[in-house]
């Protein structure tokens, strides 16, 4: 389970989108709209990849944690000083990751050369990559991945989140006067 009530949050967002669409329709046509948002419907929509996989194949998907069901490697990996999310979206990016990790032959191995093959051999590939990634430091590795155009990011704890330069730039943490002289 994730730490927050995702159904409530996502239903609220869907509700706002639906209200905006209804207001736009009213502006264009003069007619109102009925907005119907249900938590169940919202959470079902959040299972987009798993739903489609099931509806197309008839196979019940297994739990994959942070891993993408259709793209490999696309999940959280442990590194020597934390964790990263690695989101390798295509075969070219996979070849770059393999070269960067000193495993260029892996990208030519028929078991891993295409995403379709990597999905079949997910378990073996994730172990191979994980063994190497655990030896690498997070920040240096992320810089190398970024330089190669491979999507990846840090998994931060909450103090790291609020120390992040982008979070600070976006002013996501507000200082509030609580009335007793403290913030």
Write out the residue ranges for each language-model feature.
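Active-site-adjacent "lid/gating" segments in soluble enzymes
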Residues: 1-84, 88-89
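Alpha-helical scaffold segments in soluble metabolic enzymes
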Residues: 15-22, 50, 96-100, 128, ...
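Alpha-helix/helix-capping structural signal
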Residues: 42, 92, 156-159
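Short secondary-structure capping/turn micro-motifs that flank functional sites
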Residues: 43, 114, 161-162
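Aromatic-enriched alpha-helical interface/lid elements that frame and gate functional surfaces
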Residues: 72-148, 152, 165
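A glycine-rich dinucleotide-binding beta-alpha-beta segment and adjacent secondary-structure elements
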Residues: 147-183
